[in-house]
UniProtKB/Swiss-Prot annotation:
InterPro entries: UPF0637, UPF0637_domain_sf. It holds the Pfam family DUF1054. It comes from Staphylococcus aureus (strain N315). This is UPF0637 protein SA0957. It comes from the Bacteria. HAMAP family: UPF0637. Transmembrane segments: none annotated.
Amino acid sequence: MTKYTFKPKDFKAFNVEGLDARMEALNEYIRPQLHELGEYFSDFFTSQTGETFYPHVAKHARRSVNAPKDTWVAFATSKRGYKMLPHFQIGMFEDQLFVMFGIMHEAKDKATRAKVFERKFKAIQQLPDDYRVCLDHMKPDKPFIKDLTDDDLKEAIQRAINVKKGEFFIARAITPQDKRLKSDKAFIAFLEETFDQFLPFYSA
């Protein structure tokens, strides 16, 4: 019995039609692991940074018609919420599990906070080849950093700094069939390795 990881069939929760039915599927197949990951990694971030982190599992409470296309657990230093702060995420769409760190368009002092990515531009470019960026957390698209030109990357960061709706995340994503989802041990190792790469951007 696994505690943290997801099986390919768990991702099929996103194929269930209708808001109530899909929420039921998420509650059965995905949210239990998100809560466990929330406990594990809030402790992980607290020990790594010396700041107290809190987990926030997506509730999708505002939805009244459209079923969610993704779900997640986010980690931030506020008990009340994460959207206003730089935060870490573990989440899923039907075809990917993603891990991210960055700043949403709702972030407080977004222009100032996003400048960390400007300052650490070289460090972004030096991330391993399978690392990506996400410029809109609502969409599954996450281009590989290695496929972006310097100008593409600079423009994306500037958009997060200067445009109200702009946001910027560094990310990693794997498919539902990925071998790193086959066991809790492999999955946690993958997540810790990813967050170890993200943490210098948080503490900068």
